[in-house]
């Protein structure tokens, strides 16, 4: 079992943790999040970005992690970036808690997400269905109020 954790922080009030667990290289990864400080009753883009670099805030994280050269999509789409986690849904206080299993996200192997950055966006991810070029790259998810590097956990 490999475990990883990401502590989300940023210029905004958005903060939280994201944990990852994977039993073996062929197993799906369980991703669990507990995030506060978002707008209430909203959907916010939630992605793994390429670089574990936050020197210039969340912008330094680069584009979505996409080792297979696909277009942006929903987590359940065949054509998607590895880093496309879709949207988190917030409650009436702006908090989001949840968990999902993802067979594209790996902690083990050549396309591991360890050392990369999780970004919570300021807008809703259109899941690549926005009908424009930016939708196929970013899902038009908007600014990056919070992010954190994924690190190996005990």
From Swiss-Prot:
This is Superoxide dismutase [Cu-Zn]. Belongs to the Cu-Zn superoxide dismutase family. The gene is SOD1. GO terms for cellular component: cytoplasm. Its cofactor is Cu cation; Zn(2+). The lineage of its organism: Eukaryota, Fungi, Dikarya, Ascomycota, Pezizomycotina. Binds 1 copper ion per subunit. Pfam families: Sod_Cu. Homodimer. Disulfide bonds join 58-147. Substrate binds at residue 144.
């Amino acid at each position: 079992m490999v475990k990883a954790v990401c502590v989300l922080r940023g210029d905004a009030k958005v903060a939280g943790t994201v944990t990852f667990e994977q039993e073996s290289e062929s197993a799906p990864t369980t991703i669990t999040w507990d995030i506060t400080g978002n707008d209430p009753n909203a959907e916010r883009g939630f992605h793994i970005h390429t670089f574990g670099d936050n020197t210039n805030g969340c912008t330094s994280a680069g584009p979505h992690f996409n080792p297979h050269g696909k277009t942006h999509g929903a987590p359940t789409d065949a054509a998607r970036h590895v880093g496309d986690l879709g949207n988190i849904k917030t409650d009436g206080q702006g908090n989001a808690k949840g968990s999902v299993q993802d067979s594209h996200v790996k902690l083990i192997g050549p396309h591991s997400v360890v050392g990369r950055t999780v970004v919570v966006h300021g807008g809703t991810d259109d899941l690549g269905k926005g009908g424009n070029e930016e939708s196929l790259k970013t899902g038009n998810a908007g600014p990056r109020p919070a992010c954190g590097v994924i690190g190996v956990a005990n």
